[in-house]
Amino acid sequence: MENQEKPLVIAYYLPQFHPFKENDEWWGKGFTEWTNVGKAKPLFRGHYQPKVPADLGYYDLRLPEIRQQQAELAKEAGVSGFCYWHYWFGEGRQLLNEIIDEVVATGKPDFPFCLGWANETWKAKQWNKDGSGDKVLIEQRYGGEDDYRHHFEYV
């Protein structure tokens, strides 16, 4: 038992905490996941909502210093690496790739990571309070062998 390795702790990393063009078009200028966080309502006694972010506040992931601080906090908490959600909708169409592209290009933060492919169609009902509205925002497509190769080469 003394030579057993510790398990890797990987934190999922949602890259939607910054404005981007498509969210502005679909939900209004300046919409980010922070908009949804701020709308949270308590559902039962003792359920404190909305949760106000602690250490880094309402951060913007476009700022390299924020990503560095996140990596430092993760290390302090015993996290081994991040799993960045990766949005490849087929035929070369991506969303939210700027953050991971910058991490790869700069090597910062210097923190282990992997990608998790969030391969699903985005529909408006995912964000509508009542779950209504099947409006497709962006469709997940599987474009065949050339597209698969292109995606593989990207990652």
What are these regions (language model features)?
Residues 1-155:
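Glycan-processing catalytic domains of CAZymes
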